[in-house]
A protein has these predicted regions:
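Beta-propeller-forming repeat regions
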Residues: 1-175
């Protein structure tokens, strides 16, 4: 795996796995268990990528795969699983320089992916599913997120973003 970068932990149906991205594509690693003492590795995509996450945007019971491509690239891609393979379902129409931050989870009861980029407009964006299609919402601009993480506390949702390009750690609150 050359130029590997992205790591995203996934827990589904009690099974832990990890998404790892590199020039050679997007891979899913399953660690050894008592039932299977060997590592299992799936090649999900051959598309060069720096980061990816799995989330069920549309509530159909199958995770979509959101990918930042290529390495620290400018393209947000969303793949849908069909017949055991991931096929491109959506490409964000704008090019986004130096994609870097990624987090997936729930905000306001909806599955979302937060994306940040460190050049150009340096935005923090929220991707979700609305009215039968993918939707991107600008959360903050000119901030240059390097990492993002969401959590729920006292009935509210929050996202923490390390806005490296402006020397800031920001907290965004969603009611």
């Amino acid at each position: 795996m050359l130029k590997n970068h992205g790591y995203y932990r996934v827990v589904r149906d009690g099974k832990m796995s990890s998404i790892v991205c590199c020039d050679g594509g997007v891979f899913r690693f399953y660690p050894p268990t008592s039932a299977n003492p060997e590592w299992t590795i799936e090649n999900l995509l051959e598309t060069p990528a720096s980061d990816a996450t799995l989330i069920d945007f549309d509530g159909d019971g199958k995770d979509e795969l959101l990918v930042l491509s290529p390495f620290h690239g400018d393209t947000v891609l969303i793949y849908r699983e069909k017949d055991g393979k991931y096929e491109l379902d959506y490409e964000y129409p704008k090019k986004i320089e130096f994609l870097h931050a990624i987090w997936s989870g729930e905000i306001q009861g909806k599955p979302v992916v937060m994306i940040g980029h460190r050049k150009g407009n340096r935005d923090l964006l929220k991707f979700c599913w609305e009215n039968g299609q993918y939707h991107a919402e600008l959360i903050d601009y000119d901030c240059g997120p390097a990492n993002a993480y969401g959590f729920h506390k006292d009935g509210k949702d929050y996202v923490i973003s390390t806005n490296r390009e402006i020397n800031e750690i920001a907290m965004y609150e969603f009611d």
